[in-house]
Each structure stands twice: as C-alpha cells, then as structure tokens.
Regions:
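Hydrophobic alpha-helical membrane context
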Residues: 15-16, 72, 269
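Catalytic-site microenvironment of enzymes
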Residues: 4-5, 37, 157, 267
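Domain-terminus/edge residues, biased toward the C-terminal soluble/receptor-binding domains
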Residues: 144-145, 159-273
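Sec-dependent N-terminal signal peptides of Gram-positive bacterial secreted proteins and lipoproteins
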Residues: 3-23
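Generic solvent-exposed, charged/amphipathic alpha-helical segments
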Residues: 11, 136, 270-271
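Active-site-adjacent loops and short helices of periplasmic peptidoglycan-processing enzymes
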Residues: 21-182
Length: 273
C-alpha cells in the first residue's frame, strides 16, 4: 500500500511538471573542456578538465590581466626589434614605433596579434621571460592548479609542453577572473576598433575574431586560440538572468573542422549550463 502511494505521488509530480529533468550531457570534441560558474569557480561539467594541454592564444587572457593590473592604458610603448619580428598573426608593428598600451591591448584581445602581446610584455616586465614568470605566478594566485606560461602570446613551437601548458579548468578560471575587470569586459565586447601609433602613420582597423559573441544569446565573448600543437581553442563566457558561465575548450580539432568545432563545443557547454 505504501509503495502504491509513493507511485501515485510521483506520477502526480510528473503530471504537474514538478520533477526536474536532467540536462543531456554535452557532446564535446575538445581534448579538454570545462564549464564553470563564473562567480564561484565551481566546475559544472568537465572532460579531461585537469589534463595539461597547450592553450595557444587563449594565453593572451593572462597577458591582458597583467597589463590591466600593472600598466596604464595611456602609457607609451616603444616597439622592440623582438616584438616587431613576431610571426603571424601580427599587426605589422615596426621597431621604434610608439603606441599607447591601451591600443595594443585592444588589438591583441580582438584579433590576437602576437607582436602586440610581446610589446606589452616587454613594457610591463622589461623582458618576456620575466613577464612569463609573473604570468605563472598570477595564475597560481587566481587558483590555477597546473598552468605554466612560457610565452605571452601563446606561440609554442619553441617551447616544450612542460614550459607552456594549462588545463581547461584553469583557463576557464583565468577567464572568469579577467571578466571581473570592467575594462576587459568592455574591450572584448567591441566588434571593431580603429587604432594607430602616436604619429598617426600606422592606422589599423581591427575586427573581433570572436564569432561566439554574435552567435550566442547572452555571450560576453573572450578569446580564441590556435597553434599546430594546441589545435583550435576557445575560452568563452555568457550571462543570462544574472548567471555567468565560463567555458574553456582546448584541442577542439584542426583545420576547418576544428575551427568550427570550438564554436559548437562552446555552445554545447553553455546550453548544458
């Protein structure tokens, strides 16, 4: 009799819609993926979330954090030979050019310019090696569990996996931390900007490479990445009804298929959340 009463009660709840249905597990191609609560850092879903992987240009999120916390956006950056020689993607900075730090930061975040990242790193710390050590230290302070930076722009062909790696969880956590900075949020939300060096002789129109920002309701954006080692990567964020979710997908694939997969992986994670 007791079992029958319980059964009738459960049937009643189902009819009333009071029994919550569990969201379907997301299908994600990425080698490593994480979805976290953007306010608490709690892991909501993961796939190899703590596996050390290359993270490509999502690295530049941490570069931006240090620039925002340690430099003035109006200070003048003089481009070094090292910065000017960085490979594509670059904004063709020339040795000796002078730019405001804010212009380089915005261009770096929107279009992933490698030369801008190095110029900013040298401005903040004097040289790239010192800047990378500060990046790694900051990651630990934020709560990252297995992240080492050997490059301010994410290029990794000259580095071993031990010298430059992170995890999907750590990159999501770093992304969530960056979003607490209002200037960071304002920069990544822009669709297009126009910047120039101080002389006005090197104008540059920069469009945002983040498709997620346009294709997903509530998207806040953040940062794409790709190297031959890392594959296509993306750290993304969205906010609806006051709930902020941050995701990271590392190694979503290679070639055109991988480029598309990082978007579908991210959307699947956000839909699950």
């Amino acid at each position: 009799m007791k079992r029958r009463a319980i059964l009738f009660f459960l049937l009643f709840l189902l009819q009333m819609g009071s029994v919550p249905t569990l969201a379907a597990e997301p299908t994600v191609a990425a080698q490593g993926a994480a979805l976290i609560d953007g306010k608490t850092g709690r892991l909501l879903w993961g796939k190899n979330a703590d596996a050390p992987l290359a993270m490509a240009s999502t690295t530049k999120i941490m570069t931006a954090i240090l620039v925002l916390e340690q430099a003035s956006l109006t200070e003048v950056v003089t481009v070094s030979k090292n910065a000017a020689q960085q490979p594509k993607v670059h904004m063709s900075l020339q040795e000796g050019e002078q730019w405001q730090a804010g212009a380089l930061l915005s261009a770096m975040l929107l279009r992933s310019y490698n030369d801008a990242a190095v110029a900013l790193a040298e401005q903040v710390s004097g040289d790239v090696a010192k800047f990378c050590a500060e990046m790694t230290k900051k990651a630990k302070e934020i709560g990252a569990r297995d992240t080492v930076f050997g490059s301010p722009n994410g290029l990794d062909s000259h580095l071993t996996a031990e010298q430059h790696h992170s995890t999907a969880y750590d990159m999501a956590l770093i992304g969530a931390y960056a979003l607490e900075n209002e200037t960071f949020r304002e920069i990544i939300a822009q669709q297009e900007i126009h910047v120039s060096d101080l002389t006005g002789k090197h104008p540059c129109s920069v469009t945002n490479a983040d498709r997620f920002l346009q294709e997903y309701s509530g998207a806040l954006g953040i940062k794409t990445g790709y190297t031959n080692r890392a594959g296509h990567c993306f750290v993304g964020a969205a906010e609806r009804d006051g709930v902020r979710l941050v995701s990271a997908v590392l190694g979503s694939g290679w070639g055109d298929a991988g480029k598309q997969k990082k978007w579908t992986d991210t959307k699947a994670l956000m839909d699950y959340g």
